[in-house]
Structure formats: structure tokens, C-alpha cells
């Protein structure tokens, strides 16, 4: 699926790969819903009220949420919601590329580039739990070339990396500051 979507990504201060702590998720949720509506129009799929609500719940923050966390939040709105309801909605959203599943956490996070063909890299903060989707084609190329070099064909080149986000790096955290200096050369 490689469909250009019209909704603009948040370009306000604090809306970077890792939004600042005071970031208002309203724009993220609005963009996600607009993208979902547009993709559904393009593909003929239906964004039911339940699917829309689950998408909003996934986008309520930048932390990956497990299906049962989503169910717990959904039950505040729809007390009779059951696990299969959530899993069906998540499968629909995954199928359209509106969300991603973070395998190592068994959790879901909103896709920042729905409608575009891409392999994501996820940066997961071990301190605050937030995750950011990164798109670095050089990482994809290195993985593909490295795998091909040993006769391996990648089927799902999703990368999940744990570390500290900019908001959680403290000036007194010398190890993280040293790692940042080393990475920046």
C-alpha cells in the first residue's frame, strides 16, 4: 500500500520523533483519524465507530498499549466490550497500516506514516515507556544487505531498539551523555 495521505503531521514545537512531555496528543489523534478515514475511502473499508474508538485509544499517548490495556480503556466507554472485539479492531487497523505491533512488548502503537510502504524502526524508551517510529532507509538497506550476504531473506524487517528518549536523559546520566557524544562523533 503506497497511498499519499493529505493530513499533515504535527510540525509544532515539541512534536518531534519523541514529542515533549507537554505535547498535546489532540493533533496526533486528529491526524490519525483523518488518515484512517482517507484510507478507508480509498480502499472501500469501513471505519466503524468501534474501530475509530480503538484507534483513538492507541493514539492517546505515544506509549505502546497491550490489547488488554486498550480493552480496559474501551470498557470505560463501552462496558460490555470483550477481548475479541478489541482484537478484531486491532487486526483491521493493522491490516490498513494505521497501527504497528511492537512484538517485544506485545503492544500496539500508532503508525506515523500510514498509507506508505515502509519498514519501521522503533525506539522504545526504557524509562518512560514511550515509543517513536523512525524511518531510516540506511538501516533497512544495511539489514537487507547483511541478511543477503549470509543467504537470508528478510520477511519482516521491523527493528525494535530500547534506550532513553531525549526527555528521559538527565544531565547527571553520564553513561547516556557519553553514548550520545560517541554516536555524534
Q: Residue spans of the language-model regions?
A:
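N-terminal leader segment of winged-helix/HTH proteins
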Residues: 1-46
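Pre-recognition alpha-helix immediately N-terminal to the DNA-recognition helix
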Residues: 52-57
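Short capping segments at the starts of secondary-structure elements
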Residues: 60-66
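A short acidic, leucine-rich amphipathic alpha-helix
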Residues: 69-75, 86
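Basic amphipathic alpha-helical segments that dock to polyanions
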Residues: 86-96
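Non-DNA-binding regulatory cores of transcription-related proteins
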Residues: 95-185
